[in-house]
Amino acid sequence: MDNMNSFVEYSICNRPATGAYSVPKSGYHSHHHLHHHHHPLDQNQGFPVTTGSFHTGLAASPAAVNGSRTDSSAPGAVYNPDGRLYGTAGEEGAHGATGTSQHHHQHPHHFPEQQPEQNGYSHPHLQTQTLQSGTLSHYNHGSSGSAYAGQSCARNSEYASTNTIHSHYYMEEPAASTYYHQSSFTSTAPTVGPSYGALAGAYCGPQGALAGSQYPQQLVGGLDAAGYLGLPQGGYGEPQTTQERERGGEEGQQAGQGQTFDWMKVKRNPPKTVKVSDFGLAGAHNSAIRTNFSTRQLTELEKEFHFSKYLTRARRVEIAATLELNETQVKIWFQNRRMKQKKREREGGCATPRTPSSSGFNKELEDTDHSSTSTSPGASPSSETSSERAA
């Protein structure tokens, strides 16, 4: 069986001018040599297999035709001056040259062991690997390490593809085990930008996860952005904190109200109740109850009224102490007596003679009590008593 090798040509994924994988160039012919139970290379994946002249890199010799040549001068993959990467593909189209002397004549079930030694071309029929992680695996962990160092967090436009790619994407083991699936994403960068932004964020560790969580609609797996970031469901973290603070403040107020201080006791003491004896009342003090004066009390009050219709406070206190009354009772009696006297004078029931002294005294009363007439201070008690009875 012919073991003629072919060259797989594809450009570096982070070139801004090209897509993720280049289309077949004109002038090259696809040439496959299939082994008995090996899987053929799928042309729909956009990986051209070209034959023709052998391409050499900057420091590498031509690759062997039968895959048996040993080239120790090339430390890793072969690059040409314009920056494109060339790798040899054998019967399976899945094994690249890494600078070691190997026969690339392996069966498909040995493919997982050869993954760290590949230049990034993954088998199209193995869904356990990714087109992206297979490309990044060698350059992040291999011997060369200069072309793809730090390219795991590339920009969204660097992953734009000119072909329609159907594949399954998995995150690498160090990142997480969340399953990402992008089905039938197409050419332009603005269309696939958000989805690749979420995917690239997954490769960047915790910082990338924060960036990837901005596009939760692109994550088809079971990853919840809010739960992954440690936030409570529904985003009600801050309102719950506010409610807890308010609840704590209310509890503090209740605890403060439970304590009774000395200044609070003073305010809470009830006011002193007025004694009934202060008003001379037998019942409730707020109800208008008529005071029953004795004959002796009435005689002494009438004598004082004849001498002076208006009492000073000192005289009122003295009379109240003598008659066993309070000041309020004496004051109210004198007010009622003056009103009665005015009523008599208005009706003309009093015709007593007036003296000059009484007239001068009446002028003083007019200024204070607005009364025009008054009984003379020299009137006999008998006549005053008779006038009260007539009234």
From Swiss-Prot:
Q: Where is this motif: Antp-type hexapeptide?
A: 260-265
Q: Which UniProt keywords apply?
A: Developmental protein, DNA-binding, Homeobox, Nucleus, Transcription, Transcription regulation
Main localization category? nucleus
- Residue range(s) of DNA binding per entry: 286-345
| InterPro entries with a match to the protein in the record | HD, HD_metazoa, Homeobox_CS, Homeodomain-like_sf, HXA1/B1/D1
In the record, what terms sit under GO molecular function?
Answer: DNA-binding transcription factor activity, RNA polymerase II-specific; RNA polymerase II cis-regulatory region sequence-specific DNA binding
Give the UniProt subcellular location, in the record's own words: Nucleus
Annotated region (Disordered), positions in chain: 62-125, 231-260, 337-391
Identify the GO cellular component terms for this protein.
nucleus
The UniProt entry, under SUPFAM superfamilies, shows: Homeodomain-like
SMART domains listed in its UniProt record:
HOX (SM00389)
Q: Which Gene3D superfamilies match?
A: Homeodomain-like (1.10.10.60)
Positions with biased composition (Low complexity): 87-100, 371-385
Q: Which family does it belong to?
A: Belongs to the Antp homeobox family. Labial subfamily.
Q: Which function does this protein serve?
A: Sequence-specific transcription factor which is part of a developmental regulatory system that provides cells with specific positional identities on the anterior-posterior axis.
* Protein name per its UniProtKB record: Homeobox protein Hox-B1a
Name of the gene this protein is made from? hoxb1a
